[in-house]
């Protein structure tokens, strides 16, 4: 299964505890995370910790990490310019690009949402307004 994730240190924390020898074990535990509903915690934890699953991090999410780091809302152990690529490499996260076609399609579809991540409130979700997800080997949760 391939899963697209939002800018969430919880995902990296869970995956790194499984795959990295030098794991980041910060306070972002899933049972305390505001975006994880109580009934989704165990399912999300199992999916993320299963190293047979792939985790994708969008360029937009990496940008949000950098913005939140700069604003002091997300204090990672090092500047986001080095933290994000290093964490992606160490935890086996693959990049997911967001290009102009994605943003243009959101506007053309007449969606009232100003976000290109309309389902970001659900853990491990990504949404496309058409069948773009069928072009990638991505299972949607």
Curated annotation (Swiss-Prot):
GO terms for molecular function: metal ion binding; RNA nuclease activity. InterPro entries: TA_system_RNase, VapC_family. Mg(2+) binds at residue 99. Disulfide bonds: none annotated. Keywords: Hydrolase, Magnesium, Metal-binding, Nuclease, Toxin-antitoxin system. The keyword Metal-binding applies. It is an enzyme of class 3 (hydrolase). The keyword Transmembrane does not apply. Residues 99-141 are annotated as: Disordered. Its EC number is 3.1.-.-. Its cofactor is Mg(2+). Toxic component of a type II toxin-antitoxin (TA) system. An RNase. The cognate antitoxin is VapB16. Belongs to the PINc/VapC protein family. This is Ribonuclease VapC16.
